[in-house]
């Protein structure tokens, strides 16, 4: 297959705009699956977390054949926290499918990835998805996309983009809203006619940039990337140029190309195609695999720096080691450093305490996905409150600023603007959206967003959406007020009982029900006042010899607040930690002993 018959395309979209569903439709209609094969929904989201959250975290590769042309499709994460994945992927492709929701229009994360794609001079095709959704306005969205392209400095060729109207869920796509259609073939045809074949030297010494790493229990590390020059053959000796300019030698053990969702073994692949190869043990993202006689490095995309850091440490609580398989600092250290091999936007630093590690990432979601993955693998650990990473620019302390877009019901807008204002947010735009909603844009310090999402969902009664993306660094904006309510802290170790909880719930809201094991210093609820109070939730009712009438025994408890990992991370303050185990997520104070805590608080007050 010469490279005239290859097209490499990435799909860019905001979270939940239907990108993975569209890839499903393309795969099904290119007859990749046998007629009797059962196909799951969202086949590209391969890990459990992706399926549960409905987001794509890792970029995936697939390929389809249409009229003798091989179309390599790369599915990219839509969330800005996984921007490191997106930037690498764009180096492998010659064009992008920009997928936009016909109801919501272009969103901030779409904007960031699109900006990167346009700067690399990739050819865009715009797909307006969910045209079957009630209240949507596809024509208005096309105008918004055009405005966005102009704002991002697209050249004349990029501004002349084709528009396809689609409903990925129903498996249809058409070139105009009036057309009838029962398939997505026009997407294939537009890709073939609009996106140019890869410009590569088929002759010449082999060269390939590693854009992704896969892992197979049998084959070990698998390097994924596009062949930039020459031909790579099964069994050929190669040179590996590292990011630090060191060169090592290796040999290609097995060579694969993509077809549908599978890797197909091949003997050789020419420039222009996306391949996977095994056999090189110490291969990493950003390395260049070349002809052994002509090692030449390909420059690698600079990945955006992390903006948020958290401390991961060994669980030293009273229940440590009960529920997890991997509990020591060596286990945690090895797992974090292994994660660095694939997760290019992550940074891990050892601290002056052997049992703690500072982990930095692109945002709260980026880090919480890592914590959740480790939890499912059987790890036990403590994590601290996220902190933003400050920078010094021209002698001035600067902090990361996010661009925040909220879409809220009109009757909640005043409350939301006031709360964001308190968190040092500045409103930059406000416009009416469909169906009694208002869309407001803000610039806000990343610190101000930590812990706000849960409050936002409460204020909008679950009917609002908020999306943010890193914008720039600006001078430090000053203190932001923290949580206004204190906590209810367990006073002794034991099992919670209804009587103790009934007395505790008069002071605030509870996080636990009866029959839960607690320890001294564990946070069991939220106080209605500003200070923390110690409370005994294990306290039994003293028995008397007076017969009860029955009514005073029937103590009614309010159902406890369920805390997900994200909510727990957002909730804690600087003197608190989240204890993460495979079975439980607990909140606790850093100092468990109540008397020591009181002494610390008094000495701080004196300072």
Predicted segment positions?
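Gly-rich Lys/Arg/Thr-decorated short loops/hinges at beta-loop-alpha junctions or inter-strand turns
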Residues: 40, 67-71, 91-97, 126, ...
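Short boundary/loop segments of OB/S1/cold-shock single-stranded nucleic-acid-binding domains
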Residues: 196-197, 209-217
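P-loop NTPase switch module centered on the Walker A-proximal segment
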Residues: 1-104, 144, 213-216
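Conserved P-loop NTPase nucleotide-binding/switch module
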Residues: 86-100, 105-149
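Canonical P-loop GTPase G-domain recognition
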Residues: 123, 133-193
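Active-site glycine-centered loops adjacent to acidic/histidine catalytic or metal-binding residues
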Residues: 129, 167, 363
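Switch/connector loops and helix/strand junctions flanking conserved nucleotide-binding motifs
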Residues: 34-35, 107-108, 133-139, 171-176, ...
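Accessory interaction regions appended to the cores of large information-processing enzymes
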Residues: 162, 189-193, 197, 220-607
